[in-house]
From Swiss-Prot:
Keywords: Amino-acid biosynthesis, Cytoplasm, Histidine biosynthesis, Isomerase. NCBIfam families: hisA-trpF. This is 1-(5-phosphoribosyl)-5-[(5-phosphoribosylamino)methylideneamino] imidazole-4-carboxamide isomerase. Its EC number is 5.3.1.16. Belongs to the HisA/HisF family. It is found in: Cytoplasm.
Length: 241
């Protein structure tokens, strides 16, 4: 089975950045978000993972930049939007901007009834981001704790969640390899699909994730590994096929 790859474009203060372990203030600036997204599309990406970090941290938003990316590239690539989607207004804005799929994170922990209602309404256009430290969920902008991972999954499974985006916060942006055990554990406990995120640093990491395909891990988000040129997107896509 092939693995779908989603190059990430994380936007803070109008610029494409990468964080270390999701910490505000740890940014490395990579310039224009639109240029970054163009690069990944030209390199063969079928999906882009687009994150509004200011919205996630509650420090404003980059809605105009995100809309510009979707407007130019939305007919060439599927766009998954993430960051600060926690109510009807923010979800509707992302969907109206042209997102093929929207990730909700904090809201799934803070407002389960709302989360259940939007999963029911939008089906596989909504994924839930599970940002994990150990077996504990990290909530708003990765700052607060949000409860037990598997208790939360049990609820989300019961309301029909179709996809989890699983990030080991300790590994994100650290180039230290993905948490294969965590991915295996999550995937083996749910019928939902799983997107792997965080820590991917070499092509062998993608090969290891691909081995979890039969459990339902069918996608991976690539961030710092691409920006730091650990490998090219073309090389990664070749491995993922």
């Amino acid at each position: 089975m092939s693995l779908t790859l989603l190059p990430a474009v994380d936007v803070r203060d109008g610029k494409a950045v990468r964080l270390r372990q999701g910490e505000s203030g740890s940014e490395t600036d990579y310039g224009s978000p639109l240029e970054a997204a163009r690069t990944w599309v030209e390199s063969g990406a079928e999906w882009i993972h687009l994150v509004d970090l200011d919205a996630a941290f509650g420090t404003g938003n980059n809605r105009d930049q995100l809309r510009a990316i979707v407007k130019e590239l939305g007919d060439k690539v599927n766009i998954e939007m993430s960051g600060g989607v926690r109510d009807d207004a923010s979800l509707d804005a992302a969907l109206e901007a042209g997102a093929a799929r929207v990730n909700i994170g904090t809201a799934a922990l803070e407002n389960p009834d709302w989360t259940a209602s939007v999963i029911k309404k939008y089906g596989d256009r909504v994924a839930v981001g599970l940002d994990v430290r150990g077996h504990t969920l990290a909530a708003r902008g990765w700052v607060k704790e949000g409860g037990d991972l598997f208790e939360t999954m049990k609820f989300l499974d019961s309301v029909g969640c179709s996809r989890y985006v699983v990030t080991d916060v300790a590994r994100d942006g650290m180039m230290s390899g993905p948490n294969i055990e965590l991915l295996r554990e999550v995937a083996s406990r749910t019928d939902a699909k799983v997107t792997a995120s965080g820590g991917i640093s070499k092509l062998d990491d993608l090969r290891n994730i691909k081995e979890l395909a039969e459990l339902g891990v069918d996608a991976a988000i690539l961030g710092k590994s691409l920006y730091a040129r650990a490998f090219t997107l073309e090389e990664a896509l070749e491995v993922a096929r």
